[in-house]
Amino acid sequence: MQTQSLNQTSYVFRTENLNVYYGSNLAVKNVTLDIPARQITAFIGPSGCGKSTILRCFNRTNDLIPGARVEGKLTYHGKDLYAKEVDPVAVRRRIGMVFQKPNPFPKSIYDNVAYGPRVLGMKVDLDEVVETSLKRAALWDEVKDKLKENGQSLSGGQQQRLCIARALAVQPDVILMDEPCSALDPISTRRIEELMKELVQDYTIIIVTHNLQQAGRVSDMTAFFSVELVGSNRVGELIEFDRTEVIFNSPTKQATRDYVEGRFG
């Protein structure tokens, strides 16, 4: 596993020897990396290497999985994300997540976006929040005349942008994306990628993707994870983390080169 200190001035997350267990089974081991602010970081690697597991550590959604536990150090703006006094719900407000399959609520488009601010009791103008969030998610022009329609009636690409708008409505600092385009057609995928490039001006974005071309197109930084057999268990580990152009053009690890050149994984 390679640990690199990258010359960035501001980090949102820093991990040190991070291990994730499911029950007694080690799922990912010894992950040490720094996630820079206002950049897009891509996690790539074969299935089962721990990309999504590590992503879920950043907003503590692993807490929702029975038997899951995290060891090691993970800080968010310099503060221990797993300290006893930290409220996981507050963490998830600041660190939003967009999942692989679009998952709009069975509510109107308006109520999907307004849901978070309502639940959190945010003292905001909901009409303004809904409009602003939908505009930021590049969806407003397509839905502004049908806000009362069910969000699940939208196309797959529109539903995913609605989920992004829903995440933006609670004013997050970070957006996590777990394979956000895997269920979408190429045109919808391109729109999501264009949207990411716009959003990174104001948000830190981390994306898990199996699509190497996508990682190369959208990300500033790339972390390559792989799998090691430990006894009968498959354990994920971070192999290399660097600027995306380095990972794809001149990686220092042979395993990284083999993966990005299509010889493995």
Swiss-Prot record:
<comment type="function">
    <text>Part of the ABC transporter complex PstSACB involved in phosphate import. Responsible for energy coupling to the transport system.</text>
</comment>
<dbReference type="GO" id="GO:0035435">
    <property type="term" value="P:phosphate ion transmembrane transport"/>
</dbReference>
<dbReference type="GO" id="GO:0005886">
    <property type="term" value="C:plasma membrane"/>
</dbReference>
<keyword id="KW-0997">Cell inner membrane</keyword>
<keyword id="KW-0813">Transport</keyword>
<protein>
    <recommendedName>
        <fullName>Phosphate import ATP-binding protein PstB 2</fullName>
        <ecNumber>7.3.2.1</ecNumber>
    </recommendedName>
</protein>
<feature type="domain" description="ABC transporter">
    <location>
        <begin position="13"/>
        <end position="260"/>
    </location>
</feature>
<keyword id="KW-1278">Translocase</keyword>
<dbReference type="Pfam" id="PF00005">
    <property type="entry name" value="ABC_tran"/>
</dbReference>
<keyword id="KW-0592">Phosphate transport</keyword>
<dbReference type="InterPro" id="IPR027417">
    <property type="entry name" value="P-loop_NTPase"/>
</dbReference>
<dbReference type="GO" id="GO:0016887">
    <property type="term" value="F:ATP hydrolysis activity"/>
</dbReference>
<dbReference type="InterPro" id="IPR003593">
    <property type="entry name" value="AAA+_ATPase"/>
</dbReference>
<comment type="similarity">
    <text>Belongs to the ABC transporter superfamily. Phosphate importer (TC 3.A.1.7) family.</text>
</comment>
<keyword id="KW-0547">Nucleotide-binding</keyword>
<dbReference type="InterPro" id="IPR005670">
    <property type="entry name" value="PstB-like"/>
</dbReference>
<feature type="binding site">
    <location>
        <begin position="45"/>
        <end position="52"/>
    </location>
    <ligand>
        <name>ATP</name>
    </ligand>
</feature>
<dbReference type="GO" id="GO:0005524">
    <property type="term" value="F:ATP binding"/>
</dbReference>
<keyword id="KW-1003">Cell membrane</keyword>
<keyword id="KW-0067">ATP-binding</keyword>
<comment type="subunit">
    <text>The complex is composed of two ATP-binding proteins (PstB), two transmembrane proteins (PstC and PstA) and a solute-binding protein (PstS).</text>
</comment>
<dbReference type="GO" id="GO:0015415">
    <property type="term" value="F:ATPase-coupled phosphate ion transmembrane transporter activity"/>
</dbReference>
<dbReference type="InterPro" id="IPR003439">
    <property type="entry name" value="ABC_transporter-like_ATP-bd"/>
</dbReference>
<keyword id="KW-0472">Membrane</keyword>
<dbReference type="InterPro" id="IPR017871">
    <property type="entry name" value="ABC_transporter-like_CS"/>
</dbReference>
